[in-house]
């Protein structure tokens, strides 16, 4: 269940704050809420999305024809009408709170009402392998910049500027940290356990990565080795390169884990090496779905079984055979023409005019 927003205080965060990476064997629940003002075009647009681990399970959009909190995962269909009515009520209430907050922040930052502004809020909890609270989150942003956040002790706030300090003082006076801590330690943990049980076939599965290494020449003496991990779940994975057993993390290019669009994830890590030294490098992949870590090397393409000189000789022989066949055909044609009383040049001109045998015309030259 989502946490209730304070009615007169600032509530923020969603897409600009990225999902915080969790520990191996742990699980997380996050809500991301965003409100964007649009002067002259009506009320701000408010969107809320909820994630369990890497799976979106609920969504609310104030621009929908009939704004409601809606399921985004099959296992959420188990929740009854009361659940959706309550979550919809909270979504609408938060949308109104954010509308007020946008006006309040204009005053804090001495901004005009002409421009569009964004407030964002992310909150949630991590569970450790033992099922207990590992960490709680409550982070806020304004116009894409950090604004105020609950500290790891869940008892105090960190404000990033003078405007955020105004909010901090209000929240401290209202004991907002205590209210948030009670949610994170209680309700958040309880509902995360429930979702993990209801969606265990999806959320607690482990699909190992499909791995391979590709080779990309950069110059005459350098090449890029890229280690791929595809089709894995959950998203937590480690992909590293080693040279003669020594870690190359500082020298490698690493992309963030990306969704593949089918419920699984992708990742790759690359390193530039000297040509001829490729076999000194190994890629190491660790993932929950693997019985043990993988070690990969680039495998050069297999050499042809027939030597190059042999291929050249075969092609030369074929060339002689083809040439002989063409000459024989020409001689046969010439003899046939002579028997009919016509010359070779006359036959060639006649065939050319009919547009049939081009090869004979070419042989004439």
UniProtKB/Swiss-Prot annotation:
Annotated segments matching region Alpha-2: 115-206
Listed Pfam families: C1-set, MHC_I, MHC_I_C
Classification lineage: Eukaryota, Metazoa, Chordata, Craniata, Vertebrata
Species name: Saguinus oedipus (Cotton-top tamarin)
GO CC terms: early endosome membrane; ER to Golgi transport vesicle membrane; external side of plasma membrane; extracellular space; lumenal side of endoplasmic reticulum membrane; MHC class I protein complex; phagocytic vesicle membrane; recycling endosome membrane
Transmembrane segments: 309-332
Protein name listed in UniProt: Saoe class I histocompatibility antigen, A alpha chain
Family: Belongs to the MHC class I family.
Biased composition (Polar residues): 346-359
Region (Disordered): 337-361
Subcellular location: Membrane
Disulfide bonds: 125-188, 227-283
Region (Connecting peptide): 299-308
Cytoplasmic side: 333-365
CDD domains tied to this protein: IgC1_MHC_I_alpha3 (cd07698)
Keywords carried by this UniProt record: Disulfide bond, Glycoprotein, Immunity, Membrane, MHC I, Phosphoprotein, Signal, Transmembrane, Transmembrane helix
Signal sequence, start to end: 1-24
Functional summary from the UniProt entry: Involved in the presentation of foreign antigens to the immune system.
Residues with the Phosphotyrosine modification: 344
Top-rank lineage group of the source organism: Eukaryota
PROSITE patterns: IG_LIKE, IG_MHC
Ig-like C1-type domain: residues covered: 209-297
Subunit annotation: Heterodimer of an alpha chain and a beta chain (beta-2-microglobulin).
Membrane topology per record: Single-pass type I membrane protein
Positions bearing Phosphoserine: 343, 345, 350, 352, 356, 359
GO biological process terms on file: antigen processing and presentation of endogenous peptide antigen via MHC class I via ER pathway, TAP-independent; antigen processing and presentation of endogenous peptide antigen via MHC class Ib; immune response; positive regulation of T cell mediated cytotoxicity
């Amino acid at each position: 269940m989502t946490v209730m927003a304070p009615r007169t205080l600032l509530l923020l965060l969603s897409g600009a704050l990225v999902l915080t990476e969790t520990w191996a064997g742990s699980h997380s629940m996050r809500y991301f809420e965003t409100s964007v003002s649009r002067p002259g075009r009506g009320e701000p647009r408010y969107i809320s999305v909820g994630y369990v681990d890497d799976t979106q399970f609920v969504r609310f959009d104030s621009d929908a024809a009939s704004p409601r909190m809606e399921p985004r995962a099959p296992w959420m269909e188990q929740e009854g009408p009361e659940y959706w009515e309550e979550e919809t009520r909270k979504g609408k209430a938060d949308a109104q709170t954010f509308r007020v907050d946008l006006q309040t922040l204009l005053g804090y930052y001495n901004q005009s009402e002409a421009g569009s502004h964004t407030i964002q809020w992310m909150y949630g909890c991590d569970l450790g392998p033992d099922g207990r609270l590992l960490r709680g989150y409550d982070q806020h942003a304004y116009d894409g910049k950090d604004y105020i956040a609950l500290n790891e002790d869940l008892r105090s706030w960190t404000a990033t500027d003078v405007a955020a300090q105004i909010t901090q003082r209000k929240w401290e006076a209202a004991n907002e940290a205590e209210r948030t801590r009670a949610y994170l330690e209680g309700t958040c943990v309880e509902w995360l356990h429930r979702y993990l049980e209801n969606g265990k076939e999806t959320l607690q599965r482990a699909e190992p990565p499909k791995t391979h290494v590709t080779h990309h020449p950069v110059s005459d003496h350098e090449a890029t080795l890229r280690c791929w991990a595809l089709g894995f779940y959950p998203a937590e994975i480690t992909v590293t390169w080693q040279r003669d057993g020594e870690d190359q993390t500082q020298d490698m290019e690493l992309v963030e884990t990306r969704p593949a669009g089918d419920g699984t994830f992708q990742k790759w890590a690359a390193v530039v090496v000297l040509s001829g030294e490729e076999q000194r490098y190994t890629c190491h992949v660790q993932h929950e779905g693997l019985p043990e870590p993988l070690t990969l090397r680039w495998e050069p393409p297999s050499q042809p079984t027939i030597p190059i000189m042999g291929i050249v000789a075969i092609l030369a022989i074929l060339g002689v055979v083809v040439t002989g066949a063409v000459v024989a055909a020409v001689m046969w044609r010439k003899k046939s023409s002579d028997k009919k009383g016509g010359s070779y040049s006359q036959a060639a001109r006649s065939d050319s005019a009919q547009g049939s045998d081009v090869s004979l015309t070419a042989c004439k030259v």
